[in-house]
Amino acid sequence: MADLAKIEEQLSSLTLMQAAELVKMLEEKWGVSAAAPVPMAAASAPAAAEEAVAEKTDFEVVLTAVGGKKVEVIKVVREITGLGLIEAKKLVDEAPKAVKQSVKKAEAEEIKSKLEAAGAKVELK
């Protein structure tokens, strides 16, 4: 252990030029390169991005069209969002409009089915 401490002390006292020279000498002696394998890291990044897109967890429920049963759609929007009558009517009148954002897939599917049962057309984004 004392030898390692001596080596560490000697390496710490090297100047930047001396350290660079030491690296070159060791590369030549051992036949290695001190360069980082950058291409490998760059190649794996797109695969990670594809996985993130495939595993979408938060959805936005968008009311695209009201259909013929506007009153029923307003009732369902009030139930889902907790909005008052005037706010829910305004949301329905402004379709296409997001009814709910950042919801899990199961909840988004449930909201979509309720709105479609009331006669609305809905998209999940």
UniProtKB/Swiss-Prot annotation:
The gene is rplL. It holds the Pfam family Ribosomal_L12_N. The keyword Ribonucleoprotein applies. Forms part of the ribosomal stalk which helps the ribosome interact with GTP-bound translation factors. Is thus essential for accurate translation. The keyword Ribonucleoprotein applies. HAMAP family: Ribosomal_bL12. InterPro entries: Ribosomal_bL12, Ribosomal_bL12_C, Ribosomal_bL12_C/ClpS-like, Ribosomal_bL12_oligo, Ribosomal_bL12_oligo_N_sf. GO terms for molecular function: mRNA binding; structural constituent of ribosome. Belongs to the bacterial ribosomal protein bL12 family. It comes from the Bacteria. GO terms for biological process: translation. Homodimer. Part of the ribosomal stalk of the 50S ribosomal subunit. Forms a multimeric L10(L12)X complex, where L10 forms an elongated spine to which 2 to 4 L12 dimers bind in a sequential fashion. Binds GTP-bound translation factors. GO terms for cellular component: cytoplasm; ribonucleoprotein complex; ribosome. Keywords: Ribonucleoprotein, Ribosomal protein. This is Large ribosomal subunit protein bL12. PANTHER family: 39S RIBOSOMAL PROTEIN L12 (PTHR45987), LARGE RIBOSOMAL SUBUNIT PROTEIN BL12M (PTHR45987:SF4).
